[in-house]
Structure formats: structure tokens, C-alpha cells
UniProtKB/Swiss-Prot annotation:
CDD domains: Anticodon_Ia_Cys, CysRS_core. Monomer. Its EC number is 6.1.1.16. Belongs to the class-I aminoacyl-tRNA synthetase family. Its main location: cytoplasm. Binds 1 zinc ion per subunit. It comes from Pseudomonas paraeruginosa (strain DSM 24068 / PA7). It catalyses: tRNA(Cys) + L-cysteine + ATP = L-cysteinyl-tRNA(Cys) + AMP + diphosphate. It holds the Pfam family tRNA-synt_1e. This is Cysteine--tRNA ligase. The gene is cysS. One of its GO terms (cellular component) is cytosol.
């Protein structure tokens, strides 16, 4: 029985789709003005694992993750670069897809772009105006009347009267209430714009997601996800817009993943601790980064540090060392392990608990390796199958364990030395065998002798 923590109710609930076996999930994606940072990677990986598990459980999932391709940040960055905004966004979208592929992230079923849904935004804004939830003061802007929506604050547990304390209307704004937010922004010189019933302009951020989600998934759908930094005001405003426009409940369950901290501090450019995914992947294998991001529960914060990355690498080394050198086999039943893995994942996608089951399997594989090779191989196959549901342990063990050797050691030289050592051992020339091992150790190479022969990896 799958249970999900719903931010809307602040409780863990038994998950029941709105319609039969169909699950419709929308996740807020990237604003494509720069390369993806680790926080984006956290959200990408979290909802990738959720996608994999929902499909494994047999649900007919439609996964939609949007792209925000028009926004203040995009316009500012394009102007800084001296390039059209759409040239910038195309380049950043391509880079995002490269990062996702390296992190073994499945593609969403649909990836709508905001600029492809301008007409839908016009329609929803007009509906809100017609219903009295929005107003056009005549300066090209259109605003949402927060005070008109009785349920405002139900997601974030904020009270409108508290929000009004200290709020003020900025110069140049034509708001009726300081809490009102923009649905359509009147055009400014030098900025991209589209024609609309209220004049040239562009959409506000919040209306983009309301329109893209309902266009792709319908007025009501099962799951809405994103980082917990989006809970307010973005997701709160989405609810206000969508439910006022359609008269129906918007998303049934709201899932929010935790943030990334860097050595215990919030990641930010001003603190100089801001890392893009590609910067991290220059130093660490993509699977190490992915494992770091799944080793904690998706709602928990993750502290990014060199030490934690080394621990993630060590964990994967243990897994791949358990898998290596074993013959192909059908997965063992391993009913107890399978049940506990499923119980962890059914408990609000508890990947930390699931990973602990993988460690137990790896220990059992190692225990059986010398006494019952077929049983060890079958259990290793089950370990790999379960790990695949988390998107890890799908490489050839030697490929992972030797990854990063390029530019550090000559693989051909290592193989030649290993062969020379084998010949020395066969001739019982133990001194020569030890000399070669010492030479390889000095090169940073770790040898591991087993029934299947000698394998090697780089020292941590």
C-alpha cells in the first residue's frame, strides 16, 4: 500500500489515483537562463525515482515537467550576453538534457514550454477577469485578486492577514492590494512580448504553470511536485489561479523535495558555494552524484561536501565489488529483501531505507561468493534489479571501478603488469609478484584477486 506525504494536508496519506490506475504528475522544471545547479539535480533525481517506482507498481503514469523559457532572469541574461532570448534558452535546454542523460534521468512524457502556451494563458487570464478574480488596471498589466480567493494560504499555511503586515505596493505597480500578483506583464522597451487582449506583454511565472499543467493533465490531477522553495508563493499562487478559473480542486497530492546545502550552508552565488551539475561531474562519476542524491529521503535536506561524495563513492564501490566476477544468473527470489525494499519505497518513497536493503543484499552476496557461487550470482542479479529501480548499479562493475583512470594511469600498462604478475605467481616467483603489486600500488591501482581472476580499480 503506497503512502505519500501530502504537503497540502501535512500528513502521510494512502495514495489513490483520481481515475482508475492512471496517475498524472506535474513537476515544476527549469527556468533555462543558466546551467542546471545541484538543487535542480536534486529535484530531477527525486522525481525520476518517484516515476520509476510508480511505474514499477503498475500505475499508468503520465509525467509532465515544464520548461520556463520566458522570465525576467532569462531576459536579463540574454541582454548581458547580447543574444536573443530564444538562442539562450535553446542552448540551456540542450545543456539540461545533457546533464539529465549523464545522471541517468528518464525523459518526462511531456516537456511543455511556456512560450508554446501563450494562447492558453490568455484564455485562463480572461476567465479569471470574467469571474472577478483578476483585473486589468489599464497599464498593460493584469493582476490576480488574492483577497477574492477564500482558500489562499491553504498549502503553505499562511494567513492573508499576516502576509499583509509590512507588504506594500511598489512604485509603478497598479495593484489594488499589496498581495495581488501579476498574471500578465505589460511590454517594456527591448523585451520580448506577445500581443494580448490587454496589449503587448508577456506572462507572469505563476500563470505559466497553471496553464501548462491543466493543458497537459486536465483541470484536476494526482500529483504536483517541485522543490520546497516553490511551496510559497509559486505553488500557492498556482492553486489560487487554477481553482478560481476551473472551479475544481487542482492537484490532489503535493510533493516537495528538500534543498541542497554546501558544507552546511545554503547554496548561493553570493557565498561563492554555487555548483553546477556539470562542474561536479568534472570531478565525480555521474553515478556517485546520483547516489548521493538518492541516499537521503527526498524530503530531507542534503549536505553536499567532499566527504559525503567520497562516502557515496565508497558505497558504490562496495556494491560493484559485490557484483563483479559473478556469472549471469536469474534473480533469486529473495522474498524478504524484496518485501522490505518495497515497504521502504511504499513509505513515501523512502530511498534511504531501500538503500539499506541493498547493503544487506551485497553483504549476503559476499558471504556466499566462496561457498555457493550460483546462489551468490542469483542474489547479485536481484541486487542489480532492485537497484535499477533507483537508477543505479546498471554499469559493468569493472567499468565503474576503473572509471576515472583515463589520464591517471595507462590501462594497457596496468593490464600488462597484471599479466606479468600472474605469470610470476604461476612460476612461484613470489618476490617478483610482490614487486609488481607494489609497483601497481604506487601507481594508485588496487588489485583484487578472486575466483574469476584478478581485477583492478583506482584507489580512493
Amino acid at each position: 500500500m503506497l503512502q505519500i506525504y501530502n504537503t497540502l494536508s501535512k500528513t502521510k496519506e494512502v495514495f489513490t489515483p483520481l481515475v482508475g490506475n492512471q496517475v498524472r504528475m506535474y513537476v515544476c522544471g527549469m527556468t533555462v537562463y543558466d546551467y542546471c545547479h545541484l538543487g535542480h539535480g536534486r529535484s530531477m533525481v527525486a522525481f525520476d525515482v518517484i516515476t520509476r517506482w510508480l511505474r514499477h507498481r503498475g500505475y499508468d503514469l503520465t509525467y509532465v515537467r515544464n520548461i520556463t523559457d520566458i522570465d525576467d532572469k532569462i531576459i536579463n541574461r540574454a541582454n548581458e550576453n547580447g543574444e536573443p532570448f530564444d538562442v539562450l534558452t535553446e542552448r540551456m535546454i540542450a545543456a539540461m538534457h545533457e546533464d539529465e542523460a549523464r545522471l541517468n534521468i528518464l525523459k518526462p512524457d511531456q516537456e511543455p514550454r511556456a512560450t508554446d502556451h501563450i494562447a492558453g494563458m490568455h484564455a485562463m487570464i480572461q476567465t479569471l477577469i470574467d469571474k472577478g478574480y483578476a483585473y486589468a488596471p489599464g497599464n498593460g498589466d493584469v493582476y490576480y485578486r488574492v483577497g477574492r480567493f477564500a482558500g489562499y494560504g491553504k498549502l503553505s499555511r499562511r494567513r492573508v492577514e499576516d502576509l499583509r503586515i509590512g507588504a506594500r505596493i511598489e512604485p509603478g505597480e497598479a495593484k489594488e492590494d499589496p498581495l495581488d500578483f501579476v498574471l500578465w506583464k505589460g511590454a517594456k522597451p527591448g523585451e520580448p512580448s506577445w500581443s494580448s487582449p490587454w496589449g503587448e506583454g508577456r506572462p507572469g511565472w505563476h500563470i505559466e504553470c497553471s496553464v501548462m499543467s491543466t493543458c497537459c493533465l486536465g483541470d484536476s490531477f494526482d500529483i504536483h511536485g517541485g522543490g520546497n522553495d516553490l511551496e510559497f508563493p509559486h505553488h500557492e499562487n498556482e492553486i489560487a489561479q487554477s481553482e478560481a478559473a476551473t472551479g475544481k480542486p487542482y492537484a490532489k497530492s503535493w510533493l516537495h523535495c528538500g534543498m541542497i546545502t554546501i558544507n552546511g550552508e545554503k547554496m548561493s552565488k553570493s557565498l561563492g558555494n554555487f555548483f553546477t551539475i556539470r562542474e561536479v561531474l568534472e570531478k565525480y562519476h555521474p553515478e556517485v552524484v546520483r547516489y548521493l542524491l538518492i541516499a537521503s529521503h527526498y524530503r530531507s535536506p542534503i549536505n553536499y561536501s567532499e566527504e559525503n561524495l567520497r562516502e557515496a563513492k565508497a558505497a558504490l564501490d562496495r556494491f560493484y565489488n559485490a557484483l563483479k566476477g559473478l556469472p549471469e544468473a536469474a534473480p533469486a527470489e529473495a522474498a524478504e529483501h524484496v518485501e522490505r525494499f518495497a515497504a521502504a519505497m511504499d513509505d513515501d518513497f523512502n530511498t534511504a531505507g531501500a538503500c539499506s536493503v541493498l547493503f544487506e543484499l551485497a553483504r549476503e552476496v559476499n558471504r556466499l561468493r566462496d561457498s555457493d557461487l550460483p546462489a551468490a550470482a542469483a542474489l547479485a542479479a536481484r541486487l542489480k534489479q532492485l537497484a535499477g529501480l533507483l537508477g543505479v548499479l546498471q554499469l559493468e562493475p569493472e567499468a565503474f571501478l576503473q572509471a576515472g583512470a583515463e589520464g591517471k594511469v595507462d590501462a594497457a600498462e596496468v593490464e600488462a603488469l597484471i599479466q606479468a604478475r600472474l605469470e610470476a605467481r604461476a612460476a612461484k616467483n613470489w618476490a617478483e609478484s610482490d614487486r609488481i603489486r607494489d609497483q601497481l600500488t604506487a601507481m594508485g591501482v588496487v588489485l583484487e584477486d578472486g575466483k574469476g581472476g584478478t581485477t583492478w580499480r583506482l584507489a580512493d
